[in-house]
């Protein structure tokens, strides 16, 4: 598995689902909603922005991977990785000891950076596509956090299973 696949939905959706189920099992519904909701909101917003801008992929002479068939802006792999790892970092600071949460944050930052770099290296995105994906992900994670108080069922502290 190449590093770029850390931003793929084939990996992130099952990983997110398992993590959300574990959080729900332990009564951490707010954290589960943050992780799952952030990823879903990011997926939807990335595809909406791609359709709005319709930016072609970079021209290339040597393809290192098969050229994706959708639009370039913003980078979906980078946005998805950023949304997942940012929300996991926020949850880590809520449920883990600070020293462990700091390790999660550092690892998350590193993984998002190398996923973004890999998209540029593989010549399937421009730098701005990758940066826009990161910004869009941060906005979606923030939006989910801001909307959470509006979900009354989250306020009840009970186990869902």
Region locations from a protein language model:
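Membrane-embedded catalytic cores of phosphoryl/pyrophosphoryl-handling enzymes
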Residues: 61-161
């Amino acid at each position: 598995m190449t590093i770029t696949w850390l931003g793929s939905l084939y990996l992130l959706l099952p990983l997110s689902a398992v993590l959300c189920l574990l959080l729900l099992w332990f009564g951490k519904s707010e954290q589960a909603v943050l992780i799952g909701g952030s990823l879903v909101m990011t997926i939807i917003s990335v595809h909406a922005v791609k359709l709005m801008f319709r930016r072609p992929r970079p021209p290339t002479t040597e393809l290192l991977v098969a050229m994706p068939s959708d639009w370039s802006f913003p980078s979906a792999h980078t946005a998805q990785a950023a949304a997942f790892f940012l929300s996991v970092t926020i949850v880590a600071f809520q449920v883990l000891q600070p020293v462990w949460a700091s390790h999660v944050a550092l690892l998350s930052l590193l993984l998002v950076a190398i996923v973004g770099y890999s998209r540029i290296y593989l010549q399937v995105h421009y730098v701005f596509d990758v940066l826009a994906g990161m910004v869009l992900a941060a906005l979606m994670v923030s939006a989910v956090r801001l909307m959470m108080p509006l979900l009354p069922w989250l306020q009840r502290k009970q186990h869902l299973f």
